[in-house]
Amino acid sequence: MYSSYSSLQQSQLAAQGYYDTQSTYLLVYAPGRNTALRATLADQLHRKFRLADTLGSALTEWVDGVLLVSEDVECMSTALMCFAKALQDGADYAVCNAVFGFGGATALYQSRAHLAQNRCALVSRPLLERCRAAAKDPENVTELLALAAQFCAHPARIPQALLHYERDICAEDAFSATGKRAFLMSHVLDMTGAPIVLVSAVPVLRSMGYEVVVLGPSDGGALQLFVDAGAAVITRPGIRATPNLWGLALCSDLVLVNTVVMARTVRALSGTAVPVLWWLHDAFAGYPHIAHQIPTKLAENVRLYSVGHHAANAMHAVRPDFQIGQLIYGLPDYAAEDFPRCDLGYPADKPLFATVGSFERRKGHDIFCAAIRLLPEEVRNKATFLFVGMAADKEMMDAVRSLTTDCPENVFYCKRLSRDEIKNLMEQCTCLVCASRDDPMPTFVTEGLIFGKPSIVSEHTGTAGVITEGVDGFTYPDDDPQKLAALLEWAIFHPEKLAAMKAACRKLYETHYSKQSFEQTLTAAVKELTE
């Protein structure tokens, strides 16, 4: 039994608690083909249930709720227990996440903002009676499911993937029957910049009346951010080479494709009836590997936008004729949130300079390390330096490890911080440093602006184009460690002047990166594309 579950289901089952639900009597109504369902019902931990193919005579006075099943499906052994627990907790309608396809490689995480056309849902007895009274055919399970989703007052979404459909996923599994559909496609769902800022598009699209579904590979940390924002999420490894899932886009009213990495998808959708907004966040470094997949021409249904001039210039280097608008991302005002405060443990009597991002050559960690080494020892010892990020390049990682070994008292490395820890870092640091050789619009620098923290950035970043030198940040040219070191030395001796930049940094955030600014720009772009 256990070995037949998908890897996602196995991991969730290992963390699943047990609930005593045996006092709740469930009816499982599956009038159609139910071979797989019947087999998996034999393994249920919740034993107080009955499988029926008609409702009338089966609806005895002891039935507390009915699991409506319109399609044959395999249930995990904890499925009825979780549905019964939702009923006990006051839900009148409960659905769960699911996996699809052979082996369950595709997973659906239900939206908290809209109810999809679920083919399996638990309905309370009072709600079922209301649905039967309103139905043209009180025995029609599909009609009852649709009415239950419409009439329910207390819906519950169970976070476990309790169901496994052997077929491929379709649009109706994620979208409702009547809403406008926005389909967002991302090549990663990790905590890097592009997926994090894509999250900010979800509430904007929802405010425009769209139901939002996100397609990406397996969760790398950002999936829950999309769910919390109100999107449904579909995951499948290798989506860049899975054209059958791209077909979901053709069932949508708007498609937002994130980054140039999804160029094959744009090529497939160019010339179709669905409007496509292609949002570019990419640096020059990635284009040699992807340029052959970028269409030479784009049909009228595709519009390009970038997070700044740096990202636009990177695309223009290979497709100079493309028209690209500006769509700088917006981030929530984290400083106004009531997040858990904690002391990160770095010396409070020294200015803290931090950089956040994956360790790859274009991010320039070696330049930052070289600049720190160029500081006179007595100057370097007056400050603390922190590197945060996953090691993607051995040379960059070796540069940081060597520096932390030589300067263990004031140079530190952290592989990863949680979102709340990042917010605490931005609140507690003195200045951010982005030494990138090629970076369209570094997210962590923007997060620093939210907390009024200035940054020192390379001229080869998108941020350099919006900074006012010496007012809300600093730039240095030529990827030169010596010039970066000079700015660091000045900053180390003048932390009070960095602190005095707080108001200007906040103004820069509110002008270019706030949710309000982003909402206005994205709304205008979507209306231009769809109206």
Question: Positions of the model-derived regions?
Answer:
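Short, structured helix-loop element that forms part of the nucleotide-activated donor/catalytic region
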Residues: G220-A229, T384-E409, E421
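Short alpha-helical donor nucleotide-sugar binding micro-motif in glycosyltransferases
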Residues: A249, R416-L417, N424-C429
